[in-house]
Design a protein with these regions (language model features):
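Basic, Lys/Arg-enriched alpha-helical interface segments
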Residues: 2-60, 94
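Enriched for short, Lys/Arg-rich terminal
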Residues: 65-68, 73-98
């Protein structure tokens, strides 16, 4: 199974990187690398994430990397990463089409 990052998830990664890079560009690169690597781990264990509490019964799951929630859905063609956001923020339901 492969990991497919949606356009929205990629936009969120860029926003995170741009924000962190304002104070520490090297840390921003490391953070994005960790998030992407964590998402890549879903290829071996797609069900390792928990069900997103804000969206019960939808099949939307999440894994955590540091302070960030990586939200995804398991599809026949692969794991679809829907969005990434800082855990203290309100859940972006528009990002997942719910």
């Amino acid at each position: 199974m492969k990991v497919i990052w949606t356009e929205q998830a990629l936009v969120r990664l860029i926003e995170i990187q741009d924000f962190v890079a304002q104070s520490n560009p090297a840390a921003a690169e490391r953070l994005i690398r960790r998030i992407v690597e964590r998402g890549g781990g879903l290829t071996k264990f797609p069900e390792m994430g928990r069900t997103v509490p804000e969206l019960p019964g939808t099949g939307v799951r999440e894994i955590i990397e540091g302070r960030y929630r990586i939200v995804y859905r398991i599809r026949a063609k692969g794991i679809q990463v829907l969005t990434v956001f800082e855990g203290h923020r309100q859940f972006p339901t528009d990002d997942v089409g719910e």
